[in-house]
């Protein structure tokens, strides 16, 4: 088996699978970083006998990205049980991983960790590490104050009329000592279950409102307790994976595109488990809307796949009634109507985010394969020469872009492609010193400076451009043409505007639109996107320097505290929106310091 190119593999958590020539899954594994993990299979000479055998008969390796390593564990666990890959080590039983259980069958439910399924309890998991799960239970206990004691201790507390130890220190809501009614306690259990099932936004919103109210009333101790609960909830959420009820059976579909190629990803979920992952690429038609693309993709997907009972989407597809009729006509089971859902609940939305991430990853992988192909790259150059009517092959292409920082600090960027590939050593940044915020004048200045550096360069030199691309429209193109005339050089120049991917040529009133899905258009898009990325990188550096200098204006802030603020808040807008409790929670920041920072941030009117 030929190993995949390292650059094609995402640096994300996920589950990978090796398959034989018949598509049978031989091995399933999980990884915190797919690129590093899969790379180790093909670079490590000291492999075990089992892995060496698996690689010798494998013909294909695939992967599915997920949100975190917990979700990776759950998907791996599900697929090992579903497909029984012959090269995986067999688990003795389901006790290998711990679960979180809520004993809803008891009159006063409790929260506990278990390695085996408990009758009349709702289970969440499995989880990869039991010590992480213990921390999670501790955090959930802090938020909901749910009983965790054993039935024996609970009965003893009821008999004595005194709460258990956790009830005495207010870590438990105290159902054993009748500090709360049965109805109030059941409400807490209901909130806990909703939180664990992914319905977290309402709880966080409620806690934040209470915290702000306490802060406004100067009840800082109560506000601090609520702040700790919010932080605990956010920590639990960061460790949680997508949890689907066993009753959920549906296809989750996401479509992303770059205006020429659409990437479609489908997760087939049966009884709450991801059973299969499918991926395709389609050519996107010209002027096709997102909803039309979604409808077209669904039709093509179910020309290949069997129909599910339910299809879950982010957005409403176009011609929904006609699409539903088409799918139901194809459905063999006439008694069951296919449901298309485009308002997913919070739980389903989280899984759809994972599906969308995989679609984006596959689209990028497709683009990388396409751009790395030598034949395709040279075809794109020949196409450009033909469509732009150039005298020679555009071996060296330079692209120019103008960017700003908060409407000031104008800068220009230049990226260079040679033979259809980026030449990063030739990239350049230019600081533009123009009094007014004028893109046209800035572009004129940028091109003049670049052209003057070429006056001593021979036209047959590899450093001399064969084509200049301006990121913008007619005004920016006019500025570039003016710069060429002023310096006295003749280099083909075109402007590329993003709205319709139009190319503007000097002296021509109408724009040129390259054929969609052509290699030449793909190359120009890649050059333009690289120009944006390079410009954004420089502006990010300048923004950080600007932000730091403005923070030093606040009295009483030294270098260490400024760096702490920058790590916690990315902008002055965030500092102004933050509560005094949020700022004072930073190490070394008291309430007075936090109040001073808030006052100064408002006074400086910083953005």
UniProtKB/Swiss-Prot annotation:
Pfam families noted in UniProt: GIY-YIG (PF01541), HHH_5 (PF14520), UVR (PF02151), UvrC_RNaseH (PF22920), UvrC_RNaseH_dom (PF08459)
InterPro entries given in the database record: GIY-YIG_endonuc, GIY-YIG_endonuc_sf, GIY-YIG_UvrC_Cho, RuvA_2-like, UVR_dom, UVR_dom_sf, UvrABC_protein_C, UvrC
Keyword DNA repair applies: yes
Subcellular location: Cytoplasm
One CC-aspect GO term: cytoplasm
Residues annotated as domain UVR: 201-236
GO biological process: nucleotide-excision repair; SOS response
Record's keyword terms, sorted: Cytoplasm, DNA damage, DNA excision, DNA repair, Excision nuclease, SOS response
Domain GIY-YIG: 11-89
GO molecular function, one term: DNA binding
Record note on quaternary structure: Interacts with UvrB in an incision complex.
Primary role: The UvrABC repair system catalyzes the recognition and processing of DNA lesions. UvrC both incises the 5' and 3' sides of the lesion. The N-terminal half is responsible for the 3' incision and the C-terminal half is responsible for the 5' incision.
PANTHER family, A to Z: UVRABC SYSTEM PROTEIN C, UVRC/OXIDOREDUCTASE
NCBIfam families in the cross-refs: PRK00558.1-5 (NF001824), uvrC (TIGR00194)
Homology family: Belongs to the UvrC family.
The protein's name in its UniProt record: UvrABC system protein C
Organism the protein comes from: Tropheryma whipplei (strain Twist)
Origin organism lineage: Bacteria, Bacillati, Actinomycetota, Actinomycetes, Micrococcales
Gene this protein is translated from: uvrC
């Amino acid at each position: 088996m030929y190993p995949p190119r390292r650059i094609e593999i995402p640096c994300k958590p996920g589950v990978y699978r090796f398959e034989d020539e018949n598509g049978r899954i031989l091995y399933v594994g999980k990884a915190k970083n797919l690129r590093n993990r899969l790379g180790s299979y093909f670079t490590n000479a000291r492999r075990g006998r089992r892995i060496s055998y698996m690689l010798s008969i494998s013909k294909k390796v695939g992967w599915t990205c997920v949100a975190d390593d917990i979700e990776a564990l759950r998907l791996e666990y599900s697929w090992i049980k579903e497909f029984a890959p012959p090269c995986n080590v067999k688990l003795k039983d389901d006790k290998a991983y711990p679960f979180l259980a809520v004993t809803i069958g008891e009159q006063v439910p409790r929260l506990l960790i278990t390695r085996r399924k408990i009758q009349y309890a709702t289970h969440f998991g499995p989880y990869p590490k039991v010590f992480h799960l213990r921390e999670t239970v501790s955090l959930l206990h802090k938020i909901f104050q749910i009983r965790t004691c054993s039935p024996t201790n609970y009965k003893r507390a009821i008999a004595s009329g005194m709460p258990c130890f956790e009830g005495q220190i207010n870590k438990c809501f105290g159902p054993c000592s009748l500090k709360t009614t049965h109805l109030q306690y059941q409400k807490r259990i209901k909130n806990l279950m909703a939180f664990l099932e992914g319905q977290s936004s309402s709880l966080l919103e409620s806690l934040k409102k209470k915290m702000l109210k306490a802060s406004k009333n100067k009840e800082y101790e109560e506000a601090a307790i609520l702040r700790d609960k919010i932080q605990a909830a956010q920590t639990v959420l960061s460790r949680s994976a997508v949890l689907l009820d066993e009753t959920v059976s549906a296809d989750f579909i996401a479509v992303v595109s770059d205006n020429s190629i659409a990437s479609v990803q489908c997760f087939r979920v049966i009884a709450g488990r991801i059973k299969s992952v499918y991926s395709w690429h389609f050519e996107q038609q010209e002027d096709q809307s997102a909803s039309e693309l979604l409808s077209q993709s669904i039709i093509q997907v179910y020309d290949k796949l069997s129909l599910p009972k339910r299809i879950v989407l982010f957005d409403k597809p176009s011609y929904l009634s006609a699409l539903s009729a088409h799918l139901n006509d194809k459905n063999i089971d006439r008694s069951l109507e296919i449901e298309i859902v485009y308002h997913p609940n919070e739980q389903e939305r989280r899984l759809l985010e994972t599906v969308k991430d995989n679609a984006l990853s596959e689209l990028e992988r497709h683009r990388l394969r396409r751009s790395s192909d030598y034949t395709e790259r040279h075809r794109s150059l020949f196409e450009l020469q033909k469509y732009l009517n150039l005298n020679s092959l555009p071996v060296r292409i330079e692209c120019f872009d103008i960017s700003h920082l908060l409407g000031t600090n104008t800068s220009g960027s230049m990226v260079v492609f040679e033979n259809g590939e980026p030449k990063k050593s030739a990239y350049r940044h230019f600081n533009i010193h123009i009094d007014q915020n004028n893109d046209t004048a800035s572009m004129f200045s940028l091109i003049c400076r670049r052209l003057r550096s070429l006056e001593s360069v021979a036209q047959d030199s590899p450093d001399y451009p064969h084509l200049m691309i301006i990121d913008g429209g007619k005004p920016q193109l006019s500025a570039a043409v003016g710069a060429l005339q002023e310096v006295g050089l003749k280099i083909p120049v075109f402007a590329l505007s993003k709205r319709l991917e139009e190319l503007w040529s000097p002296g021509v009133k109408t724009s040129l639109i390259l054929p969609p899905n052509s290699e030449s258009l793909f190359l120009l898009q890649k050059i333009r996107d690289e120009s944006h990325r390079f410009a954004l990188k420089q502006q990010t550096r300048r923004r950080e320097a600007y932000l730091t200098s403005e923070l030093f204006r606040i009295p009483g802030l030294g270098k260490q505290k400024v760096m702490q603020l920058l790590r916690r808040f990315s902008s002055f807008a965030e500092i102004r929106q933050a509560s005094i409790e949020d700022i004072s929670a930073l190490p070394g920041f008291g309430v007075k310091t936090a109040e001073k920072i808030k006052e100064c941030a408002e006074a400086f009117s910083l953005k």
